[in-house]
Amino acid sequence: MNRFLLLGLALLSASAQADCAYRALAIEPETPALYVGAGERVRVEFDNYKLDGEVDSFPEPPLRIRAVQGGKACEVEGGIWLRNAVLLDAGEQRLLVQSFSGSGGELTFYDTSSCAQLARVELPEASWSLQGEQLVIGRNCSAAGLAHCVEREVHTLNQQCLPQ
């Protein structure tokens, strides 16, 4: 009887955990003025006004999230978005982007159907990573990368694949 209870609790616990599987989108130029990353159902677009040379960020709004079929789009204003920090969850319902300004940065989670902001985490330093279903943020870092951080702040992703 106890084995069945433990098995039931283990199954319940496993089903209560999120299965977010955020993955980085490759943001590539479709034209010199338009950079795009796409999943199966969602496409992310950034306007680019620096038409010569390599681009590592997009300082001009808006960021557009567009359905691949039907073309319906919504827009996010503001931000200087990093090209190498655009992630889409496995269900393509949430988009995670890193942005920065002169005073710091942030990670922002958006709903891909409405562009509504779902969550935001401040990044006084740029060191962070997704490790399974946890968002790990480095604090008091001497260099880039979590290995160089004195402190680590861990946010477990909830059922909606958002940091708690």
Question: Where are the predicted features?
Answer:
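Sec-dependent N-terminal signal peptides
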Residues: 6-9
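Positively charged n-region of N-terminal signal peptides that target proteins for export
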Residues: 1-4
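Exposed acidic/polar residues on beta-strands and adjacent loops within beta-sheet cores, strongest
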Residues: 18-164
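N-terminal signal peptide c-region/cleavage motif recognized by signal peptidases
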Residues: 13-15
